[in-house]
Amino acid sequence: MGDNLKKRSSMTTDGDNRAPNRAMLRAVGFTDEDFHKPMIGIASTWSEITPCNIHINKLAEKVKEGVREAGGVPQIYGTITVSDGIMMGHEGMHFSLPSREVIADSIEIVSNAMRHDGVIAIGGCDKNMPGCLMALCRIDAPSIFVYGGTILPGNCDGQDVDIVSIFEAVGKFNAGKISREEFIRIEQNAIPGAGSCGGMYTANTMSSAIEALGMSLPGSASMPAVSSRKANDCYEAGKALINLIQKGITPKQILTKKAFENAITVVLVLGGSTNAVLHLIAIAKEIGVGLTLDDFDRISKKTPHLADLKPGGKYAMTDLDKVGGVHGVMKYLLKEGMLHGDCLTVTGKTIAENLKDMPDLVPNQTIVRKKSEALHPSGPLVILKGNLAPDGAVAKISGLKKISITGPAKVFESEDDCFNAIMTDKIKPGDVIIIRYEGPKGGPGMREMLAVTSALVGKGLGEDVGLMTDGRFSGGTHGLVVGHISPEAFDGGPIAIIQNGDKVTIDSSKNLLQVEISQEEIDKRLKSWKPIEPRYKTGVLAKYVKLVQSATNGAITNLL
């Protein structure tokens, strides 16, 4: 241990010319000995604005202890987070996906400016995970991601409840299915404390994907936020990073095409969020791996859906943790030949080596099925194409009895207009809702539609109405819904010229998304289509519109 591990920070601390730099560092606690140790950046997404992140400062301190114990000198710094749950359903959601880019940019800026020899990033809410990983890819110093952990379920009248319970209660209350008293009780009990939303929603999906990628320690993905195990996970991550520096292992050696195939497989088996498609493509682009919708389609067709997890199933992430966690699932998949066991990880060992001594899934548990008893023989994330989405779209079919619908289009130019129509009973069984100008540029920010989809479920329309959009869906969404339609309406995609009453089809069994009008009619309408003006003229969203790429490219803003 010593100066030979300071491959980056030596330019900040070494030599007579760096005396002013060292003077500044002494003021924040550095000693003479510290200048001979590797400098470690700890990127914390702590914030008081969301339960997903409210505990992360304590976790960052545990990481700091581990780094110190292993011979490094740690520096905690902050980056932003927003709360998808709190922003949902209003103008604030425009800022959600752009926050991913700001997280990535800010971590890249700080750790490259300080010349950190290694970086540990700690994330909680949805956009933290991909934002942190994108930054670690750009920096490409030895790095580890630590997940803040999943929330414990709430309890209302003896039943487990969570964030989706209260979103769906809005529709139920409006439809007269529950009393105001029950409505209020659900609100008061849905979120009991710290941690990320508890089903296989976006945060838990991405934590699982990151463990499968090899960028977090085995077992990290499914641990509850409030637990001694999570605190120890953080401590061990701090120690493990010094091992990575000693071995010279960086994200570029870990994040290979096969690693991304592992992540996709785990997401599909668990019934993960559609957002994983967007985020994994974005992370892959940052590290220089070619990953496309076709890869998701190829893997989905041969990967069964095995885990009975919310939103389409019964169980929460804490339930999965009790029967073996994500690493238990991965061990089963490796035995079944469904994972690449030779992929390197942040332990310095391969996936197969990590899993060798990990426990199997608990016998006779009912959360994760065997391949022979799969919930569905193929993956629940389905890539659709057709004359409505020439470049592709993404659907999720887990928990659905119907996976196709043909019906008249009900067209809305924004999520807000659609939500009002649902709440005033203007949507009927058999309708196919079109919400457009909600894409990366058109929204801007590709808003999530949990308020809309939950209102449909609460109204009893979840199985009888289709919904398609160039926006996104929350990991908590379930129903016959299609998002990420590309090209988006703002760019003149065919979704821009659909008219009320056009017959449209969502057919997940055929990977088809189409409007039943002739190509000549589509071309005619597109010729008369006029682009809309950007909704924001100044500020971060105006800048975002100028930089953001399509959903099929991960909605990245990096100039790759």
From Swiss-Prot:
Binding site residues for [2Fe-2S] cluster: C52, C125, C197
Cofactor note: Binds 1 [2Fe-2S] cluster per subunit. This cluster acts as a Lewis acid cofactor.
Cofactor or coenzyme needed: [2Fe-2S] cluster; Mg(2+)
Entry binding sites for Mg(2+): D84, D126, K127, E448
Alphabetical keyword list: 2Fe-2S, Amino-acid biosynthesis, Branched-chain amino acid biosynthesis, Iron, Iron-sulfur, Lyase, Magnesium, Metal-binding
Residues annotated with N6-carboxylysine modification: K127
One of the GO BP terms on file: isoleucine biosynthetic process
GO molecular function: 2 iron, 2 sulfur cluster binding; dihydroxy-acid dehydratase activity; magnesium ion binding
Pathway info: Amino-acid biosynthesis; L-isoleucine biosynthesis; L-isoleucine from 2-oxobutanoate: step 3/4; Amino-acid biosynthesis; L-valine biosynthesis; L-valine from pyruvate: step 3/4
Reaction(s) the record says it catalyses: (2R)-2,3-dihydroxy-3-methylbutanoate = 3-methyl-2-oxobutanoate + H2O; (2R,3R)-2,3-dihydroxy-3-methylpentanoate = (S)-3-methyl-2-oxopentanoate + H2O
Superkingdom as given in the UniProt entry: Bacteria
Pfam family, one: ILV_EDD_C
Keyword Chaperone appears in the UniProt entry: no
Active site residues of this protein: S474 (proton acceptor)
Stretches the record annotates as Disordered: 1-20
EC number: 4.2.1.9
Assembly notes: Homodimer.
Function: Functions in the biosynthesis of branched-chain amino acids. Catalyzes the dehydration of (2R,3R)-2,3-dihydroxy-3-methylpentanoate (2,3-dihydroxy-3-methylvalerate) into 2-oxo-3-methylpentanoate (2-oxo-3-methylvalerate) and of (2R)-2,3-dihydroxy-3-methylbutanoate (2,3-dihydroxyisovalerate) into 2-oxo-3-methylbutanoate (2-oxoisovalerate), the penultimate precursor to L-isoleucine and L-valine, respectively.
Official protein name in the record: Dihydroxy-acid dehydratase
